[in-house]
Regions:
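Catalytic-adjacent loop/helix segments of enzymes that bind and process anionic phosphate/sulfate esters
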Residues: 1-53, 57
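Metal-dependent phosphoester-hydrolase catalytic domains
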Residues: 41-62, 67-140
């Protein structure tokens, strides 16, 4: 689980309706931008650590998790380098995994060593939390 944004209820309300303003009209946008910046820096460092562990592993890697970041992010591309993305192999559509805020975010991932064959990838559209579960069947 990589660093979350930690948006407050007010942050989320503002994102849903930007016409809402704070006392000075700038407090919510500033708060949101600060949280995005701080969490991005933390995810960058976390991604570097995860990548080092992947490279040290003497075994074929399967990596599953909530990246809290989108497919064009540093965390996603750095961690996923040289691995198979099970959604790309067998998923379909947008494949959103996060149900709050923007419903198009795919931030939960399953990556595998290329020696695995991806039989199927499924996103279960059941709201058990603010994320939809994802499942991949892999064959070695």
């Amino acid at each position: 689980h990589l660093q979350t944004l930690r948006f407050s209820k007010n942050n989320k309300r503002y994102i849903d309706d930007p016409s809402i303003t704070g006392d000075d009209g700038l407090s919510e946008p500033r708060s949101i931008l600060e949280k995005i910046k701080k969490s991005d820096i933390k995810r960058h460092h976390q991604a570097d650590k995860v990548r080092k562990e992947i490279e040290k592993s003497p075994y074929p890697v399967i990596l599953c998790g909530d990246f809290n970041d989108v497919p064009n992010s540093y965390a996603y591309t750095h961690i996923g380098k040289g691995l198979i993305n099970t959604f790309v192999e067998k998923g379909s559509g947008i494949g959103n995994t996060f149900s709050d805020l923007a419903s198009t975010l795919r931030i939960d991932n399953i990556f595998s060593d290329p020696r695995f064959h991806v039989e199927q990838y499924i996103r279960i559209k059941k709201r058990l939390s603010d994320h939809y579960p994802v499942v991949a069947d892999l064959v070695y």
